[in-house]
Amino acid sequence: MSTYFISDIHGCYEEFRILLEKSSFNDKKDYLWIAGDLVSRGPDSLKVVKYLYSLKDRVQIVLGNHDINLIAVHAGIKDNKKENYFDEFLSSPDSVELINWLRCQSFLKVDEKRKIIMSHAGISPQWDINIAKVCALEIEDRLSHKNYALFLKEIYHNNIDFWRLDLNQLDRLRYSMNSFTRMRYCYPDGRLNMFCKKSPDFVKYPLRPWFLMPSSISKVYSIFFGHWSSLKGTHVPKPFFPLDAGCCWGEELVMLRWEDGKWFSQAYLSKKCI
């Protein structure tokens, strides 16, 4: 029994299945942890989600910003843009069932026995592990609720970038969503920056990668995340494991087997990715 970590599949189904074959992933005994962004940009979002849905308890997923966008588009809250490649998914007779399944996925996975954490963008350096767990549960509860569309209408907000215990309920949810699905850099005071996507090699003070900020969590846990394809080729210190290698941008899909630390990769094949 092995555990594999991967992220940012982005609808690149063919590359994903080849990578699973290369790694000898066994869907009857192995586990797959995915750090979000299953969909969008690549041509086969529907195939990716249907396959993961079929794995049942063999897959552990945290949602990324593109997964949230798909749910919002399906609910009629956001426009379906051409570059999403959502048409096949939205017209599928299985779309409602699959969307409801996605809505019930997590924003944070924690394995206390192995001291592993997974989220899409990362973990706010302003949080300790207990606050992170509570904040994840709060947005998971809202997204899985029957009135999730109202939640999604209110959750998008760029200015909620600093954590305080006295945040009102809505701003607390907004901050949590921004932290789990959007952040890359922080300012020295801990404020999030959700807009700069460049490699740290080309970014100067005052911006600093979130994983280089002081944090009590990184002293205890190995942290797996995606969301940041421009980190490829940049030194990221342990205990952080970036998983987004930019497959949908013409690069590659990568996967780590936890037990022996072996990495697997598959170069981009699809010609419809943007």
From Swiss-Prot:
Coiled-coil stretches, from where to where?
none
Q: Which catalytic reaction applies to this protein? A: P(1),P(4)-bis(5'-adenosyl) tetraphosphate + H2O = 2 ADP + 2 H(+)
Q: Which GO terms describe its molecular function?
A: bis(5'-nucleosyl)-tetraphosphatase (symmetrical) activity
Q: What class of enzyme is it?
A: hydrolase
Enzyme Commission code: 3.6.1.41
* Source superkingdom: Bacteria
Q: Cross-referenced CDD domains, in alphabetical order?
A: MPP_ApaH
Q: Give the transmembrane ranges.
A: none
- What keywords does the record list, in alphabetical order? Hydrolase
Mind telling me which SUPFAM superfamilies this protein's record contains?
Metallo-dependent phosphatases
HAMAP family attached to this UniProt entry: ApaH (MF_00199)
What role is this protein assigned? Hydrolyzes diadenosine 5',5'''-P1,P4-tetraphosphate to yield ADP.
Matches recorded under NCBIfam families: apaH (TIGR00668), PRK00166.1 (NF001204)
| Family membership noted in the UniProt record | Belongs to the Ap4A hydrolase family.
Q: What is this protein called?
A: Bis(5'-nucleosyl)-tetraphosphatase, symmetrical
Taxonomic lineage of the native organism: Bacteria, Pseudomonadati, Pseudomonadota, Gammaproteobacteria, Enterobacterales
